[in-house]
Amino acid sequence: MLKTNPHDHTLFKIYLNELERLAVSAGFEVVDKIVQTRTKPKTNFLIGRGKVKELKELVKTLNVDYVIFYNSLSSRQKLFLSIELKCEVIDRYELTLMIFENSAQDNISKLQIEYAWLRKLTPFFKLEASIKYKGEHPFFRSMGEYAFYKKLNMVKRKEKTIRLSLEKLVWERLRQIDERKKLGIPTIVLAGMYNAGKTALFNAICGCNKPVSDSPFTTLSSKYQLSEIESQKTFFVDTIGFVVDLDPMLIESFKLNILDLRSADIVILLVALDDPLEIIELKFKESIKILKNIGVEEKRIIIAMNKADLLNGEKRAALSLFLTSLLSGFEWCFVSAKEKEYSSLLSLITKKLQELNRPQSPPQTASMFISRRTFQSSSS
């Protein structure tokens, strides 16, 4: 990991632990962790030459198969590191996609994952091939160069085919969203970091039995269920989990999930209470940032602090003081998907729907403007 903020003595440890957890989930055995502090990443290797040399020795000594970087690697950095270290080099984006692949069950998820892979690796493949066949021009289109262009064109065609397929799915999803709007059925989307308990709460509220696992990203494609809250028909949607410091390109590759969040009447942001306070705060702030980047307004967000069953009365009271400050400006409540304790959440949803459906009175400035225009017209 490259740490670019020399004054960060805590946050990078959280990020590194998160990376280790993801690596273990993907089936890797983590044998060591290395951090370098530099204010600016190096163009070719991300890290400095001395650290590359140290890492190379470690790879050889420990017989390492993969080196996983927390930082996003450019195609150039990935290629040069792979050549220098003589092993597979991946970043957190690729690691996340590996976990997605292990969890993918439906065709839509697999299609989105493949598209994300192609977007990431096509530039790398082009750079790798350009270096490999550099200088190999004994005559026009040597065999190596010909093979390169043939493979590159095949990859481009595949990427285009998948992109067009996803665009069709996007239009179909937009049509479904529009149909729900016409029916007047509000949509409630559950969002949050992976393992926050979204699917467990979805099952509890909707009476479903969708797969739940401690492994990250059990849910990749959105799940829908028509339910009722105080005789009000409501669509509940369970979506893919977030990760801390989520790569924007990864978000862009999962447009179908973004559409569900962006079009929701209410987004229930689940935050798990089984983490230390600093991680609870980090995950909450990161989740809010992701939702804002997607286009979800704060007024449509309700915070559900899940796994409240882990708290006794004294702990809950003490934690409430911390959360009241942290969640200032948001409506929030404690929930427990495990114990099916979510009545407070349903009350907040009902209240929020009433607020959102309430006609808005025009601003005072607009009224004054209209009055002046009317007055001028009558006098003329």
PLM features: residue spans?
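C-terminal-of-GTPase-core extension/linker across diverse P-loop GTPases
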Residues: 119-196, 202-203, 292-380
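Switch I (effector-binding) loop of TRAFAC-class P-loop GTPase G-domains
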Residues: 183-186, 205-235, 243-256
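Residue-level signature of catalytic and energy-coupling elements of molecular machines
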Residues: 19, 67, 118, 201, ...
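Conserved C-terminal guanine-recognition region of P-loop GTPase G domains, centered on the G4
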Residues: 15-24, 56-59, 73-83, 87, ...
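G-domain G4 guanine-recognition motif of GTPases
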Residues: 2-5, 36-39, 98, 239, ...
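Short alpha-helix plus adjacent loop in nuclease-associated cores
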Residues: 95-113
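N-terminal accessory targeting/assembly segments
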Residues: 1-98
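Flexible beta-alpha connector loops of hexameric P-loop NTPases
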Residues: 6-10, 209-211, 240-251, 272-281
